Design a protein with these regions (language model features):
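Active-site loop/oxyanion-hole signature of alpha/beta-hydrolase fold enzymes
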Residues: 15-18, 26, 50-58, 64-105, ...
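Short beta-strand element of the alpha/beta-hydrolase
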Residues: 33-41
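Active-site glycine-rich loops that stabilize anionic/oxyanionic intermediates
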Residues: 41-44, 108
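Gly/Ala-rich beta-loop-alpha elbow adjacent to hydrolase catalytic centers
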Residues: 106, 110, 114
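Flexible "cap/lid" loop of the alpha/beta hydrolase fold
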Residues: 115-119, 126-156
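Conserved alpha/beta-hydrolase catalytic His-Asp/Glu region
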Residues: 143, 156-207
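Conserved serine/cysteine hydrolase catalytic core
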Residues: 184-236, 241
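Catalytic histidine-centered segment of alpha/beta-hydrolase-like enzymes
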Residues: 248-257, 261
């Protein structure tokens, strides 16, 4: 495998030909804690994790991030947008970079991918952190809500400042593309909608129930998890740690990176017993 300068974006290719852009951040001077793989949410990109990644590196962790298929600098229109394809991508990253056993930290759709991976590949996963993510469903109105949200973007944005104000955080502006009349999303709208299609018809409680690794569930105080979902998750797996982050909405990693870092650090240093 080709090595790349610290923190620079590199590319690996999955078995179905999808190109994944990733960054491999090693701690200095030497790794003192286990590796972490961070998975972003729908319509996001790996740069969302920058603030948290810096904090985790300071704890001695090797931190790997990547753009999910259809996102960021990865293949824009991949051959598949299925949940299984997203899991295979994460498995490929883990294998190519020799990360196993790894702690998975995933937010929203990235957390869902991490959850499925932990259920299906327990040998690869040391522990699991879900940020505003869970197995609940089916959610038949989800594709329509995502379509409505994407269609509400007032593109072209006339400036990055306007985009930041609308999208809620500067991190969301970093993958916008400049055209002659303004700034546009870099992703394909239909790919985003297709990426959540299975969540409209499927619940993933069996997968959640068979996870055996130590797990932390993080909610934002003003997050968007479905009513009753966290409570059911804790009932089915009572060994799960649960943290509610004050002052955070769905994007906990952007709203409260310090508090999220503290929750993760505490969890990793005193992991709960496997259920």
């Amino acid at each position: 495998m080709t090595t790349h300068p610290e923190g620079q974006t590199a590319i690996l290719t999955t078995p179905d030909g999808t190109r994944l852009a990733y960054r491999d951040h090693h701690p200095a001077p030497a790794e003192a804690a286990g590796p972490l793989l961070l998975l972003h949410g729908l319509a996001g990109h790996q740069g969302e994790w920058d603030a948290l990644a810096r904090r985790l590196r300071s704890d001695g962790h090797r931190v790997v991030t990547y753009d999910a298929r259809g996102h960021g600098a990865s293949t824009r229109v991949p051959a598949s947008t299925s949940r299984a394809a997203h899991v295979r991508d994460a498995v490929t990253v883990i294998g190519e970079l020799s990360l196993a056993p790894v702690t998975l930290i995933g937010q929203s759709l990235g957390g869902h991918t991490a959850m499925l991976l932990a259920a299906d590949h327990p040998d690869l996963v040391r522990s699991l952190v879900l940020v505003e993510a869970g197995p609940g469903g089916p959610n038949p109105d989800l594709p329509g809500r995502i379509a409505g949200w994407l269609d509400s973007w007032p593109t072209p944005f006339t400036s990055l400042e306007q985009a930041r104000d609308f999208l809620g955080h500067e991190a969301w502006t970093r993958t916008l593309r400049k055209r002659g009349d303004g700034w546009y999303a870099s992703f394909d709208r239909d790919v985003m909608i297709d990426s959540v299609a299975e969540l409209a018809t499927t619940a993933y409680w069996p997968q959640w129930s068979r996870i055996t690794c130590p797990t932390l569930l993080v909610q934002g105080e003003n997050g968007t998890m479905r009513p009753g979902e966290p409570e059911r998750m804790l009932t089915l797996r009572p060994g799960t740690h649960h943290r509610l982050i004050p002052g955070a909405a769905h994007d906990v990693h952007l709203d409260q990176p310090d508090r999220l870092h503290q929750a993760i650090r505490t969890f990793l240093r005193t992991p709960p017993a496997s259920p």
